[in-house]
Amino acid sequence: QQLEDIFRGKITNWKQVGGDDRKIVVYSRETSSGTYEFFKESVLKNKNYMSSSLSMPATGAIIQSVSQTRGAIGYVGLAYLSPRVKSISVSYDGKHYAPPSMESATDKSYPIVRPLYYYYNKENSEQVAPLVNFILSPAGQEIIKKSGYIPVK
């Protein structure tokens, strides 16, 4: 609930959630981003972001902006977690908090997780099959894991 309230502008100062007396600066992705849509659906429950949120064109821009702005908050995908910014633990129920990690995403204790899919034209299935087979192979799954994504196998 607190994340929703921050990103919707109901909570505007960190002291409202037990932090320092500092204005919260909200960074989000641009509206064409799948991450923007997912966060809006899952965290904001399809309600609008606060009008003063600062829209960033890429994940790297969010990390850079949050790392350089006191009181800032933003969101990035698990594969893009950076030591330049502090990640926060999140809870389904306000009692049991989980940090963003491969383990918490896999065991579903971290509540903000979405699947990613590959889509291709059926007419190209013969040409795409070797790529799909490689992605699903142990070597492909290892590359996915090393890239910070959760393998399907």
Task: Please give the residue ranges for each predicted region.
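Exported/periplasmic ABC-transporter solute-binding proteins
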Residues: Q1-K153
